[in-house]
């Protein structure tokens, strides 16, 4: 995958934070998804569907684009405009109450959203794992704390994030939160390389939220935070 192939979709209308396409590109480079048009992927916390578009184009699979904040009807219109209306199904459900059939998905992808709803121990095993097929793959890319500042998110980030600072966790914390279910074959968690470019492309949109983030970048965001990649192979 080359995220530059999708640069025409990078705008203040489609981006809701640091460029999700760059985060997804790094995940796909390290752990490519080998899927077919018969496979189904859940894009959990898809936002305006930019990641769903890329997943659909890169894998050929059917994508279920789920987000709680963006109306399914709005994403459906976008997918039609992008020419992928038949390949991507927009969904509007709470990640805590997903209603899909069990063992349905060959892969789950979640970019810049998993930390909002999944920061409790046993969430993955109880709320996500039931919907994953045997031999499926999970790819997650989220903002978090550099490991040397583990457990200090509220102390260090509250000026920027307010009440949401507690959502930023370190690599070691995420390993513990995801757990070691009997169905997990492999789990890899690492600090991602796409930090600067993802943030810079967000700032380039001139979105009001991007401008707000930019004020804190040098003093808070850059010194203490990172993007965390997660790869999970299911037995």
Where are these regions (language model features)?
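Short alpha-helix
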Residues: 166-182
């Amino acid at each position: 995958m080359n995220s530059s192939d999708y640069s025409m979709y990078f705008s203040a209308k489609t981006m809701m934070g640091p460029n999700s396409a760059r985060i997804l590109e790094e995940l796909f480079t390290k752990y490519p998804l080998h899927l077919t048009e018969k496979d189904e992927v859940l894009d959990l916390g898809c936002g305006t569907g930019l990641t769903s578009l890329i997943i659909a184009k890169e894998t050929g699979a059917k994508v279920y684009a789920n987000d709680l904040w963006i109306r399914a009807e709005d994403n459906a219109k976008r997918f039609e405009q992008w020419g992928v209306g038949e390949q991507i199904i927009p969904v509007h459900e709470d990640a805590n109450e997903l209603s899909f059939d069990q063992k349905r998905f060959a892969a789950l992808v979640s970019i810049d959203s998993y930390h909002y709803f999944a920061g409790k121990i046993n969430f993955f095993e109880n709320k996500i794992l039931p919907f994953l097929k045997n031999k499926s793959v999970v790819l997650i890319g989220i903002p978090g704390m550099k490991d040397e500042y583990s457990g200090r998110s509220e102390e260090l980030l509250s000026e920027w994030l307010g009440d949401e600072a507690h959502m930023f966790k370190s690599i070691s914390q995420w390993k513990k939160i995801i757990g070691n279910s009997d169905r997990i074959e492999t789990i890899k968690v690492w600090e991602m390389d796409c930090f600067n470019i993802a943030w810079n492309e967000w700032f380039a949109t001139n979105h009001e939220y991007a401008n707000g983030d930019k004020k804190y970048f040098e003093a808070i965001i850059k010194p203490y935070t990172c993007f965390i990649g997660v790869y999970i192979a299911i037995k």
